A protein has these predicted regions:
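Conserved catalytic alpha/beta core of Sir2/sirtuin-type deacylases, generalized to analogous enzyme cores
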Residues: 1-232
Length: 232
């Protein structure tokens, strides 16, 4: 990533009163977790289940039509990718760069990494749920109430900061993930001084919103290292 872009991103984040993060599978992949491929991590962590159940990737196991297979994979996934998760350098850097501001996360990732990395769980909207839901009695009892409360909190934050500096980080959100992209574009459109920053491999496209845009096509991990080096 060009140093000039790193400086612009660092300035946008440092000056922001509100930072809204949208994250999808690309962020997980940048951390080394790929739900779609039988890579080394898959065989090391799920190899026994894969051989027993005839499964070729994590997502296939989690979405198996066999309820028993789904349960086994969800339990292993929750244990390995949430309970035993240690925040990656990328996630730690993301936290450091955003912790000074009001931060809100919208993610379709089901591993709960943001919560484990220290982000406020009441400001982490998981659009496709999480393996944590199987052991969270509040979510089991009131699955929609928490999401509604989180949406209200996002609306409150946007209203409070609509005339201030707002930074939007779109992290590895594919073109087909319309839910997250629409929500981020709505935030950008509602805020007077928004900077929309997109990180993606070969799909770093400007949002449907009229605001300053910075596009980064490439690996997120070294990009965030470069941004962090710009911070005094």
């Amino acid at each position: 990533m060009e140093t000039a872009k790193a400086v612009r991103i660092d300035r946008a984040l440092a000056e922001a009163n509100l930072i809204v993060i949208g994250a999808s599978n690309g962020l997980d992949m940048a951390e080394g977790l790929n739900l779609f491929r039988a890579d080394d991590h898959f065989w090391e962590t799920y190899g026994d289940l894969a051989q027993a159940d005839g499964i070729g990737c994590i997502l296939q196991g989690l979405s198996s039509p066999d309820a028993n297979v789904r349960r086994r994979w969800a339990e292993r996934f929750h244990q390995k990718e949430h309970l035993e998760y240690e925040p990656s350098p990328l996630m730690n850097t993301l936290r450091r760069l955003t912790e000074h501001a009001d931060a809100f996360v919208i993610t379709c990732n089901i591993d709960g990494h943001f919560a484990r990395a220290g982000f406020d769980v009441n400001r982490v909207l998981e659009t496709e749920g999480s393996t944590r839901t199987s052991i969270d009695e509040r979510r089991l009892a009131h699955p929609d109430a928490l999401a509604a409360a989180q949406l209200e909190e996002l609306a409150r934050l946007v209203q409070a900061h609509r005339n201030g500096r707002v930074a939007i980080l779109e992290l590895g959100v594919g073109l087909r993930n319309g839910v997250i992209k629409r929500m981020l574009a709505q935030v950008a459109s509602a805020c007077e001084h928004a900077t929309y920053i997109v990180f993606n491999y070969s799909q770093a496209m400007a949002p449907d919103a009229s605001c300053e845009t910075i596009l980064i096509d490439g690996d997120m991990a070294p990009a965030f290292e470069e941004i962090a080096r710009c911070r005094p």
